[in-house]
Amino acid sequence: MVAAVRAPVKPEMVELSPAAMERYSSDADTTAPNSSLSSAASSTGSLARCSSLSRLSFDCSPSAAVAAAATSCSPPRASVLLRPHRSGDVAWAAIRAASTTSAAPLGPRDFKLVRRIGGGDIGTVYLCRLRSSPERESPCMYAMKVVDRRAVARKQKLGRAAAEKRILRQLDHPFLPTLFADFDATPHFSCAVMEFCPGGDLHSLRHRMPSRRFPLPSARFYAAEVLLAIEYLHMMGIVYRDLKPENVLIRADGHIMLTDFDLSLQSTTSPSLDGDTDTDDEASGGASCFPDHLLRFKRRRNAVAAPRPRFVAEPVDARSCSFVGTHEYVAPEVASGGAHGAAVDWWAYGVFLYELIYGRTPFAGATNEATLRNIVRRPLAFPSGSGSCGPADADARDLIARLLAKDPAARLGSRRGAADVKSHPFFKSLNLALLRSSRPPVVPGAGAGAAPLHRSQSCKAAPTTPPPPTTTKPANATARFDLF
């Protein structure tokens, strides 16, 4: 993964031509799936094999740029003010300044591509910066996802690409991507500008841990942030359907960002407040043998100790028969070919937590077919001698076991969603409301004892040390499938 932003060599910038587009299209078709916005594909060897900057450039004439901006699907300039949790971010302020000084919505003329940093099933990701920010002033860096509509159309995945951009426009959460701008570079290329995450992804970070697994406090921290992101998505009626460590990126401040929404399912939700009710005789007006003054004291004590109402928001009519996901993380109802709903995210969350703690997924087989059989038939088992048997470890195993119930109706989270998961004793030591202000286990670029970076410091000049080598899973372990 790219842990640092090095000063790029000035590439040769060329115009987009039909021949160049065709070469880029063929290159996009062969891009390995499941790469993140800060993928290891940005290593020197990968760049040598695919010099994408020789094929894709935004150095167009002013008239062409204005024409492209006029046909852009970028939101109007006023929409850049609708991100309250990013109000103090330097990267967002730079976007806002560029938008207000431009006569047209942000478009291809406003960005300069630096290098290719990754690729996915429906697009290629580039490191980029605003042209209005001089290089000598350490400009803010962004990740631009470029989708070749012709290549995606050949794969019959145009609907997925459109759904992902539609979801990105709705999101406003500290642990989810911010869509800074979206526009068309040419009639065939659609671009989305998002935050660049210099810390890589959780899969690569796990492989740098001792024994290739996270200590329990670190796993709890990352799982809690992912939990809050899923809670927000479900509140918006979005079933994620692609949770795995490769899709959890590390921001400059060490907090996470969930990414890749092309497999997500949109539905409706009905938020409500759910709380336990008192069923004592005295609460219901029944007779009691206690004196009145003792009853008044008991009622006051119960009122103080009574649990607060919990916010519940789960997609209410999200049902799909699509066979989508990554083999090791799909729920039994998906593996068996049945219909599924929001409960698939809680199954994947259990697999995700299992992998963070134990260094592997619980049902992996020698082949993808064996993995799917294990998911449907094999009971959950925990590795022996994998750690302590203290209360914290017992809580982790209990939470995982409840999340990995093969019956979706019995699965933790299937009834009250994240409210049930958040109340589990595993998260008792965390203040989830203040999680964003907590120091993450790993802060990119910060040494021992260093103060945590603020998210806006992704705009600072990064050290020029090369990124550490990463270990990736076998191709069949992370390959996604989508049979409709």
Swiss-Prot record:
Matches recorded under CDD domains: STKc_phototropin_like (cd05574)
Tissue: Expressed in the shoot apical meristem at the boundary of the new forming meristems. Expressed in the regions where panicle branches are produced, in developing flower and vascular bundles.
EC number(s) from the headed UniProt entry: 2.7.11.1
Active site (record annotation): 242
Bias type Low complexity, positions: 472-484
Keyword Transferase attached: yes
Binding residues for ATP: 117-125, 145
Inducing or repressing factors: By auxin.
Record keywords, A-Z: ATP-binding, Auxin signaling pathway, Developmental protein, Kinase, Nucleotide-binding, Serine/threonine-protein kinase, Transferase
Single Gene Ontology BP annotation: auxin-activated signaling pathway
Other remarks on this protein: Plants overexpressing PID show variety of development abnormalities, such as delay of adventitious root development, curled growth of shoots and agravitropism.
Name of the protein this chain belongs to: Protein kinase PINOID
Lineage of the species this protein comes from: Eukaryota, Viridiplantae, Streptophyta, Embryophyta, Tracheophyta
